[in-house]
Swiss-Prot record:
Cross-referenced InterPro entries: 4-PPantetheinyl_Trfase_dom (IPR008278), 4-PPantetheinyl_Trfase_dom_sf (IPR037143), ACPS (IPR002582), Ppantetheine-prot_Trfase_dom (IPR004568)
Protein name, UniProt field: Holo-[acyl-carrier-protein] synthase
Cellular localization per UniProt: Cytoplasm
Keyword Zinc: no
S-S bonds: none
Amino acid sequence: MAILGLGTDIVEIARIEAVIARSGERLARRVLSDNEWAIWKTHHQPVRFLAKRFAVKEAAAKAFGTGIRNGLAFNQFEVFNDELGKPRLRLWGEALKLAEKLGVVNMHVTLADERHYACATVIIES
């Protein structure tokens, strides 16, 4: 296997909170997949949940080398946890097509948060 890309992002949680206060659910709708949306709606810490998802998706877009453009959208990157609780990525739509085109066979996700920040790193491999 070879590393195709590496992306890291850090999000100030208060910034996400301010956006939600200003525009309601609009950011969550733009960022979250349908499955993530269902979790977010009942999550005991929805702002922190959204900040962490946003960080992973930004990191993934950086790892793919594209950013969020040319048909890619945040909600095409879905963060879920495997049976051990490890964060993983599932791709949809244009993100999945890009991964197939690049020959991506594995994606590694690490996610951390503290009081004020959420941070994520994504590595994609061929």
